[in-house]
């Protein structure tokens, strides 16, 4: 598998796992951090640096997976912004 394909696969896996985080704030932070980090390192050409970043990304993927499990064990109430119900307009 090429390095580019590995990076894209890692990127997608990180985003998918971050979507599973139970807390809205953590989900949004993780997705933003993943996108920003990959964009910032898009132009890296040094293979040693790419390998280091890929290893760091794999560690972060495992970290997110653990946090998802912990988050589901100790879940809290959802925030108002997370409610999927739409409010009906009042008849005032």
UniProtKB/Swiss-Prot annotation:
<keyword id="KW-0175">Coiled coil</keyword>
<dbReference type="InterPro" id="IPR045297">
    <property type="entry name" value="Complex1_LYR_LYRM4"/>
</dbReference>
<protein>
    <recommendedName>
        <fullName>LYR motif-containing protein 4 homolog</fullName>
    </recommendedName>
</protein>
<comment type="similarity">
    <text>Belongs to the complex I LYR family.</text>
</comment>
<dbReference type="Pfam" id="PF05347">
    <property type="entry name" value="Complex1_LYR"/>
</dbReference>
<dbReference type="InterPro" id="IPR051522">
    <property type="entry name" value="ISC_assembly_LYR"/>
</dbReference>
<dbReference type="GO" id="GO:0005198">
    <property type="term" value="F:structural molecule activity"/>
</dbReference>
<feature type="coiled-coil region">
    <location>
        <begin position="48"/>
        <end position="68"/>
    </location>
</feature>
<dbReference type="GO" id="GO:0005759">
    <property type="term" value="C:mitochondrial matrix"/>
</dbReference>
<dbReference type="GO" id="GO:1990221">
    <property type="term" value="C:L-cysteine desulfurase complex"/>
</dbReference>
<dbReference type="GO" id="GO:0044571">
    <property type="term" value="P:[2Fe-2S] cluster assembly"/>
</dbReference>
<dbReference type="GO" id="GO:0016226">
    <property type="term" value="P:iron-sulfur cluster assembly"/>
</dbReference>
<comment type="function">
    <text>Stabilizing factor of the core iron-sulfur cluster (ISC) assembly complex that regulates the stability and cysteine desulfurase activity of Nfs1 and participates in the [2Fe-2S] clusters assembly on the scaffolding protein IscU.</text>
</comment>
<dbReference type="InterPro" id="IPR008011">
    <property type="entry name" value="Complex1_LYR_dom"/>
</dbReference>
<keyword id="KW-0496">Mitochondrion</keyword>
<comment type="subunit">
    <text>Component of the mitochondrial core iron-sulfur cluster (ISC) assembly complex at least composed of the cysteine desulfurase Nfs1, the scaffold protein IscU, the accessory protein bcn92/Isd11/Lyrm4, and probably fh/frataxin. Interacts with Nfs1.</text>
</comment>
<dbReference type="GO" id="GO:0099128">
    <property type="term" value="C:mitochondrial [2Fe-2S] assembly complex"/>
</dbReference>
<dbReference type="GO" id="GO:0005739">
    <property type="term" value="C:mitochondrion"/>
</dbReference>
């Amino acid at each position: 598998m090429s390095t580019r394909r590995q990076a894209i696969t890692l990127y997608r896996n990180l985003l998918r796992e971050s979507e599973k985080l139970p807390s809205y704030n953590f989900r949004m932070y993780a997705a933003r951090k993943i996108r920003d980090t990959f964009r910032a390192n898009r132009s890296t050409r040094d293979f040693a640096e790419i390998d280091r970043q890929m290893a760091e990304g794999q560690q972060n993927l495992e970290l997110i997976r653990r946090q998802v499990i912990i988050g589901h064990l100790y879940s809290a109430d959802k925030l108002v912004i997370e409610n999927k119900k739409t409010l009906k307009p009042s008849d005032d």
